[in-house]
Amino acid sequence: GLSEDYVKPTIGPDGAITYGFFAMSEDGSDLPDSLGGYELDWTLCEPVGRGNFVFAEKEYRGIPTLQSRYMSADTPEEEAQLERFASCGGEYADVPLLIFDVRSNPGGSDWWFMEWFNGWTGQYAQPHKCTGHRYSQIGCDFLDYPDEAMGTWQVSSRPGRWVEREGLTFLLTDAATASAGEDVLLDLHTVENTLVVGVNTGGCSLVPDNFTCYLPNTGLPIFFGTGLGFYETMENRDTVGYAPDLWVNPPDALDAVARMCEYYGLRG
């Protein structure tokens, strides 16, 4: 048989679930030219790019589609988009089909999605996780922790909570989905009838609570985290990311999901 390292479930041209050749590689030079009698011509999967918005709502071929490209705002217009994001979850609570698109979302604050999820399901997401946070001088300054806590650790663990839901949810990801963008994936992994479509995420979830600080003598900015976080299988997924359920070149993922819904009669 063919190795699972290269053969993955995907969505075919007609919308049927089938198999295709996908692999993780830095530049493709380490990939085989043939497998099991198949001659292979590898193509690089590309991210879709952020675009000129942080959150948008639309319908794609009759399917409600939410696009989250960044969870931070630089302008009043973007702030309004994020406020809409946080407040609209309840409007999608009963839709039978939903596409949630976090392709090329590099992160920001996960608060916006947490509030959306609460409106959507009636509860906050609780993925299986274990986190540790060291109370450093910088952390105490930034987060107003008491000085007497400095040098100690706060460690917490929770088993996770499953959310039952009858409607189908499709999450779109690409290699530029990272940090808070990956939190969306981890949270939606707790929801019944959710499928992730695309490719591996960027792998940027080990170190939470990142801040920009400035060196005292040069004024140079540095950006780093103040804790450690492990999720689901408790493996470090940095640089590897989280794999999709169905592998599709990210620019084609939206159309592929619509084809699949049509092929299997999921629109009702």
Language model: regions and residue ranges:
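Flexible, low-complexity junctional segments that flank or bridge functional domains
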Residues: 1-98, 102-128, 168, 211-216, ...
